[in-house]
């Protein structure tokens, strides 16, 4: 399905009775082909979705609430368009479920079917809300650099590495990622963490590269994969991981993670801007 056929940017009737058909899958393959990503994938990882506006009725008609987290594997053939995800979650509002396990089972079944792969679902109840963490991405901030920038369309030529120097292991972060929804043009704001092992990457060039996404259009997952593949091609690190945390829209935040080496799943800690 093409994004143009999704609910994005269209007048919407909000359903309040459970309806799995509201989920709108979008194949990953098209955007990957545009940047030369084929099989086998040069990375693995996950897309972490946090849903803050989930509510349903219990068997006695009393409203229940939870925060849902979805872990969508990067190798799944589809992503889910975010407005359709919001509408789908909203359809739970006036539907009675026997238990929270029944809600979780429905979410896992439906989102897995839309994505074409097994999706992990976790639900945090109000009793657990105080345990939820807020933290910033670890790493050396690129935003400390005082530099000029005037390129706002993606330009990987900014990416360079010093291959005549000894390899390093670095974790770099920036809060200056901004891209735009390819359907509505709405801005998407994000923070990015880049961990690599290899020839030292020029920090100023890397920051200018991230800034060059400012007028770029692409879904969150596609932008992170473009960042990953551009750094991999231009700088040739032995190990590379890219993790972005985007600010919330419509009660959802999307946090894609891509890596080419085995490591633990990144923390799902909400940043201050989220």
Curated annotation (Swiss-Prot):
The keyword Transmembrane helix does not apply. It is found in: Cytoplasm. It comes from the Bacteria. Substrate binds at residues 80-82, 220-221. It is an enzyme of class 1 (oxidoreductase). It catalyses: 7-aminomethyl-7-carbaguanine + 2 NADP(+) = 7-cyano-7-deazaguanine + 2 NADPH + 3 H(+). GO terms for cellular component: cytoplasm. Keywords: Cytoplasm, NADP, Oxidoreductase, Queuosine biosynthesis. InterPro entries: GTP-CH-I_C/QueF, NADPH_dep_7-cyano-7-deazaG_red, QueF, QueF_N, QueF_type2. The keyword Phosphoprotein does not apply. Pfam families: QueF, QueF_N. GO terms for biological process: queuosine biosynthetic process; tRNA modification. NADPH binds at residues 82-83, 249-250. GO terms for molecular function: preQ1 synthase activity. The active site is at 181 (thioimide intermediate), 188 (proton donor). Pathway: tRNA modification; tRNA-queuosine biosynthesis. Its EC number is 1.7.1.13. Homodimer. Belongs to the GTP cyclohydrolase I family. QueF type 2 subfamily. Catalyzes the NADPH-dependent reduction of 7-cyano-7-deazaguanine (preQ0) to 7-aminomethyl-7-deazaguanine (preQ1). This is NADPH-dependent 7-cyano-7-deazaguanine reductase. It comes from Burkholderia thailandensis (strain ATCC 700388 / DSM 13276 / CCUG 48851 / CIP 106301 / E264). The gene is queF.
């Amino acid at each position: 399905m093409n994004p143009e056929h999704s609910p994005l940017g269209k007048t919407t009737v909000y359903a309040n009775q459970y309806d799995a058909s509201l989920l709108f899958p979008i194949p990953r393959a098209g955007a990957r082909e545009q940047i030369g990503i084929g099989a086998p994938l040069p990375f693995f990882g996950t897309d972490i979705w946090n849903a803050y506006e989930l509510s349903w009725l219990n068997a006695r008609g009393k409203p229940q609430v939870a925060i849902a987290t979805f872990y969508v594997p990067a190798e799944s053939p589809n992503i889910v368009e975010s407005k359709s995800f919001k509408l789908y979650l909203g359809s739970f509002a006036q539907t009675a479920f026997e238990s929270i396990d029944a809600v979780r089972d429905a979410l896992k079944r439906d989102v897995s079917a839309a994505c074409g792969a097994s999706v992990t679902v976790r639900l945090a109840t109000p009793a657990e809300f105080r345990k939820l963490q807020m933290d910033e991405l670890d790493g050396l901030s690129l935003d400390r650099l005082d530099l000029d920038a005037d390129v706002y369309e993606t330009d990987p030529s900014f990416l360079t590495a010093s291959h005549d120097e000894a390899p390093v292991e670095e974790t770099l972060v920036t809060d200056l990622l901004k891209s735009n929804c390819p359907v509505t043009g709405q801005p998407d704001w994000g923070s990015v963490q880049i961990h690599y092992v290899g020839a030292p990457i020029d920090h100023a060039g890397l920051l200018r590269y991230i800034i060059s996404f400012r007028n770029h259009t692409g879904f969150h997952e596609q932008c992170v994969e473009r960042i990953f593949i551009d750094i991999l091609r231009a700088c040739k690190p032995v190990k590379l991981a890219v993790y972005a945390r985007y600010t919330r829209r419509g009660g959802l935040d999307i946090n894609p993670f891509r890596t080419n080496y085995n490591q633990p799943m990144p923390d799902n800690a909400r940043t201050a801007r989220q």
